[in-house]
Amino acid sequence: MKLEDLHYENNPGACRICVVEIEGRRNLAPSCKTECMEGMVVQTHSPRVMNARKTVMELILSNHPAECLTCSSNGHCELQAIAHDLGIREIRYKGEMSTFQIDRSPSIVRNMNKCIMCRRCETMCNNIQTVGALTAVNLYGFRTGYCR
């Protein structure tokens, strides 16, 4: 499974797709937030790890529009690739999904209905481009400082 793209210039540990099992620790840990230590024994593909990753991905997809065939990212979508690698063929958890208005401004158009809360856009905007226009609002998405 290729997880590097989700962590490019970003490691808030928010998505939990990269969890690993570390010998001597009870809980799984996000690999993007875990410092390597001498003698550390890490399992990256144990049944426990793969089950946790699959469950996390299923939960992410449960609040994500099932519009893959009409999405402009179809065929080169990281979510599709990870879901495929984890053997996810259908959405196991169903229910009411969050809905947001599309956030439009002269500089950006963002569809928060597709947000998976990885915080990559916030990190890139604030830390890499140093614009500071995006901030975390709550568990349901982000709001730009320019659009209301």
Predicted regions and their residues:
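A basic, amphipathic helix-loop patch mediating RNA/tRNA/ribosome contacts
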Residues: M1-E23
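Fe-S ferredoxin-like electron-transfer domains
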Residues: R16-I17, I22-R148
